[in-house]
Swiss-Prot record:
Residues 739-755 have a biased composition (Basic and acidic residues). Its EC number is 2.7.7.8. It is an enzyme of class 2 (transferase). Residues 757-772 have a biased composition (Pro residues). This is Polyribonucleotide nucleotidyltransferase. Gene3D superfamilies: GHMP Kinase, N-terminal domain, K Homology domain, type 1, Nucleic acid-binding proteins. InterPro entries: ExoRNase_PH_dom1 (IPR001247), ExoRNase_PH_dom2 (IPR015847), ExoRNase_PH_dom2_sf (IPR036345), KH_dom (IPR004087), KH_dom_type_1 (IPR004088), KH_dom_type_1_sf (IPR036612), NA-bd_OB-fold (IPR012340), PNPase (IPR012162). It catalyses: RNA(n+1) + phosphate = RNA(n) + a ribonucleoside 5'-diphosphate. Residues 634-702 form the S1 motif domain. GO terms for cellular component: cytosol. SMART domains: KH, S1. The keyword Methyltransferase does not apply.
Amino acid sequence: MPPIIHERSIEIAGRLLTIETGRVAEQADGAVLVRYGETVVLTTVVGAKQPVEGIDFFPLTVEYEEKMYAAGKIPGGFFRREGKPSEAAILAARLTDRPIRPLFPKGYRNEVQVISTVLSADQENEPDVLSIIGASAALTLSDIPWYGPVGAVRIGELDGELVINPTSHQLLESRMDIVVAGTADAILMVEGQANEISEDRFIEAVVRAHQEIKRIVAVQLELQAVAGKPKREFVPPQENVELKQQIADYLGDRLREAVFNPDKTLRVQATAALREEVIAHFVPNEPLAIGTPQSGLPTAKEVGDLFDSLVKELVRRTILEQGERPDGRKPDEIREIWIQVGLLPRPHGSALFTRGQTQVLTVCTLGTKEEEQFLDSLGIEETKRYMHHYNFPPFSTGEIRRLRGPSRRDIGHGALAERALLAVLPSEDEFPYTMRLVSEVLSSNGSTSMASVCGSSLALMDAGVPIRKPVAGVAMGLVTDQTTGRYTILTDIQGIEDALGDMDFKVAGTRDGITAIQMDIKVMGITPEIMRDALEQARRGRLFILDKMSEVIDAPRPEMSPYAPRILRIKIKPEQIGEVIGPGGRVIRAIQEQTGTKISIEEDGTVFISAANEDAARRAVREIERLTRVPEVGEIFYGRVVTIIPSGAFVEILPGKDGFLHISEIAPERVRSVEDVLKVGQEINVMVIGVRPDGKINLSRKALLEKEAAERAATAQAPADGRSHQPRAPQRPSGTAQPERRPGPPTPRRPEQRGPSRPPRPQAQRSTPPPGQYRIGDRLKELLGEDEPN
């Protein structure tokens, strides 16, 4: 029988958002198709019926799949099928995960898997936001316990106006690109980048986005009313209050002494030792430590969980009531900062940023246009000239684990730090380099991603990259009392505050505004008022960090590292690209080989020349300019005859550029046959006598011969002072061969016999050629000699 299909629609930003269920994936616990424009995302959710034993976390996995057929593309590679998730897909999966995770019941240990599959992508409406809406709708319609639904929108700013769900092309001009997700009552997640927007403007954008989120939530509730399943019964595990009090009485003040220690290593060691002592005391029989309670005795896991709960309550209560943090700081106090730049001799730029026990080494490498990252995704094909990679090795936390590729966390942290610097990078016209930043976390105690932002800014300035302003980042925390409504905002949170607090709010920016932001929470949402207080406290912290950074380096270095490549950029006409490349790439390869450079040419005629030193790059520039410049009337060239036809000859005057020498312009006297005077391969002096609109060049040899004859006649007469003048030999460019012989072909030169006993021939002193005169030889090296023509 045909499926029963239910759908609800709402207009968002002038386009119809449709959520549909019942058509596909009927065996999933929840499945929806979300359409917006011509972008379609299928999101499914499946939950296990039984909890996973022996774990202390919620086993939620979120996958985001980009199918290349969605954009009408065939995947690359040998197998022509999708492989591992792209970086964009991983970021979209994390974006989907964060707003739905806080709404699962506390203590829920059943495995849940959410999969969003992009089925159609119109390259205008971004599918990542639809994935959040789809995950929420699928969970809402399923029987899995969940306290949703949530809605999500993207917000931008064009011409001073806030725009909901801007298209991909509008985002290119937008001052902000921020995704906001939340329930009907509160904000759950914020992530994005901006071009130095103020804190007030950011709050305004979030409030505007929340208005649309409420409408999206209402649509899901309407759909749930007609197509939702009854929720499974779930009873959260209850704490053993009596046992918990016994453990607290046993510990006394020793728990505070262990937890409140400014040194993370000592705190972890003391807390772990105390935890083992408590377990040994309350679970004396070792076999019972891993089994089910017998005779009223608890298990080791139960005692350990109660100990962890006491630690959490102690930290949160002390922060709320006394304003004291585990390391002794006040809520708005930043840890001690120590900075060093230029500590690595060979990399192009480096910075070591240390904040408390968090330490990050960031290294900057400058590359060429060809080293840009190609983004093969469902969207607009593009390349990326600025990259930031984040590495989190196990020794940074004193742990041991296998070294593998970057984790999802590594990719997410790297992307956040990357977005933070985009607003201050120089344009490609100003700085035509590819920039790769790598942040190595050497020691971790919270806020490593924001330390990477600071390190990136410092390393770029150390490398001489002309960023407009330095950027700093700080991570904010939150501790709330759900009963009284009291809350305390923490500046520069450390690891224990991140783990036991309610929020991780990362804010990066310059002195003038926010450039990147990311907010994750563990409660049911926060209000704009809390967010406003957190942003103001973050602004003060950011300015403090920027002051510390400016004490070490306050502006980009005037010179780049001597080990960095030198890149020059010139512009040629698109129709001249073929002249520079040459047949089969012969010309451009010759230039690169002779000058030691790398040359890349864009479709619009932009040419990038990179070399180990600037002199080599400028030699290549001069050669390209010779290839592409249009000769002017009156210029004299020393060219080679390449083709002879009855009406004249074609003479190569520049590499790949020929001019036509008509038979009447070969000599002053009448020439019956071109071959009587010229031979293919003969090198002659010619003058440009005309350039046609289509670029064709007319040459004359006769004009030069007549001029030489007139000069010889003038110099044959004795001057008034009685001295005689010797005839002056015609000057030729450096490296030219024997002078032209007229009228017949040049006499071939016999090769010299060389041997061990024959001394090397002395090098002749090269003469300086007259202005506008060039010789085209077999080797570009002769053209690019030490004595360049003026």
